[in-house]
Amino acid sequence: MAAPEGWAEIDGALERTFELETFVDAIAFVNRVAELAEAENHHPDIRIDYRNVTLRWWTHSAGGITDRDVELAGRSGELA
């Protein structure tokens, strides 16, 4: 299974860092990802570092990346 464009497979997860214009933009992006995650009942690890947001999608029960992670990584990338 291939990682969506812009995403890297790191330590068994799909990871990508997004650089937003401002801290407020970064928080707004995180909120959009949170809404997606809640709607799908599947939640990424999220790190906020000023204007940079790093997302990591993986499935705990599978011990790695699943098709669902690939789908949600792609969808969350569209929210940036």
Segments and roles (model prediction):
Residues M1-F23:
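N-terminal first-folded block
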Residues A3, A37-R47, G74-A80:
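A short N-terminal helical cap/helix-turn-helix that marks the beginning
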Residues R16-F18, I46, L55-W57:
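Preference for bulky hydrophobic residues occupying beta-strand positions
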Residues F23, I27, A39-V53:
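Amphipathic, hydrophobic secondary-structure cores in small proteins
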Residues N31-R32, G74:
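Solvent-exposed alpha-helix faces
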Residues R51-L79:
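C-terminal structural segments of small proteins and small subunits
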